[in-house]
């Protein structure tokens, strides 16, 4: 059975043409991207690394990592976002290899090939997140690192990530997220450990609606990222 939710893919297919519009529904992704890339780069030094971006969408993170000197492959199952990523690459001149393939299928093809894997804002959009995590373990080299980000599952996350972001502030289209698919840090940590990845660090990402700014924080109640290591 394929670990693909076609309804989730359809959501982003419909919005794909606005992926690089910084005032569109993707503004939050553009705003948080520098914070996330810096956090990752500080931990792995992206320059010269072979990197896989799982669930790359229109390529916002992929291009940013390539600009840091990484050799980046971006994968996604959405045809329209990948087309946008490839078109933007022609405009920007940033070199990224994009492929329409699942993490599980690529793991069969390219085991232990990547120094770093990123899988940001993707796990809450697939039927079986643990399957993606296992695939990431298989693809990262021993001693390599895998970064995940997602949204916590609790009342505060429901209020801020769905009611606040989708209905009140209208930062995201209604229906972007499904609360049932949100993932607690304890669950993400457990799936990672079962897959063979050691959790090294966790950081939260908070939004101030008054200043309209994001910052990294110890508060992991809503958005958060984790750093994991495949031991040598």
Curated annotation (Swiss-Prot):
Listed GO MF terms: 2-polyprenyl-6-hydroxyphenol methylase activity; 3-demethylubiquinol 3-O-methyltransferase activity; polyprenyldihydroxybenzoate methyltransferase activity
Catalytic activity: a 3-demethylubiquinol + S-adenosyl-L-methionine = a ubiquinol + S-adenosyl-L-homocysteine + H(+); a 3-(all-trans-polyprenyl)benzene-1,2-diol + S-adenosyl-L-methionine = a 2-methoxy-6-(all-trans-polyprenyl)phenol + S-adenosyl-L-homocysteine + H(+)
Transmembrane parts of this sequence: none
BP-aspect Gene Ontology terms: methylation
Domain of life of the organism encoding this protein: Bacteria
Database matches in InterPro entries: SAM-dependent_MTases_sf, UbiG_MeTrfase
Signal peptide from the UniProt entry: none
Enzyme Commission number, as recorded: 2.1.1.222, 2.1.1.64
SUPFAM superfamilies for the chain: S-adenosyl-L-methionine-dependent methyltransferases
HAMAP family for this protein: UbiG (MF_00472)
Function: O-methyltransferase that catalyzes the 2 O-methylation steps in the ubiquinone biosynthetic pathway.
Protein name: Ubiquinone biosynthesis O-methyltransferase
Native organism: Pseudomonas putida (strain W619)
Originating gene: ubiG
């Amino acid at each position: 059975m394929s670990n693909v939710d076609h309804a989730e893919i359809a959501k982003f297919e419909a919005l794909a043409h606005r992926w690089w519009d910084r005032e569109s529904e993707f503004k939050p992704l553009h705003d948080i991207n520098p914070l996330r890339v810096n956090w990752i780069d500080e931990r792995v030094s992206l320059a010269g690394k072979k990197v896989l971006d799982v669930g790359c969408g229109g390529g916002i993170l992929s291009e940013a990592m390539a600009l840091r000197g990484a050799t980046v492959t971006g994968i996604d199952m959405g045809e329209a976002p990948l087309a946008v990523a490839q078109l933007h690459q022609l405009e920007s001149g940033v070199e990224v290899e994009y492929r329409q393939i699942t993490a599980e299928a690529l793991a069969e093809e390219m085991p232990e090939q990547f120094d770093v894997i990123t899988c940001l804002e993707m796990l809450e959009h697939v039927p079986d997140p643990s399957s993606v995590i296992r695939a990431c373990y298989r693809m990262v080299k021993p001693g390599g690192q895998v970064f995940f980000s997602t949204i916590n599952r609790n009342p505060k996350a429901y209020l801020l990530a769905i009611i606040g972001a989708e209905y009140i502030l209208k930062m995201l289209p209604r229906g972007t997220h499904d609360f049932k698919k949100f993932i607690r840090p304890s669950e993400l940590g457990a799936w990672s450990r079962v897959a063979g990845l050691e959790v090294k660090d966790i950081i939260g990402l908070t939004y101030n609606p008054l200043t309209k700014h994001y910052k990294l924080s110890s508060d992991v109640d809503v958005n958060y990222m984790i750093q994991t290591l495949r031991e040598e």
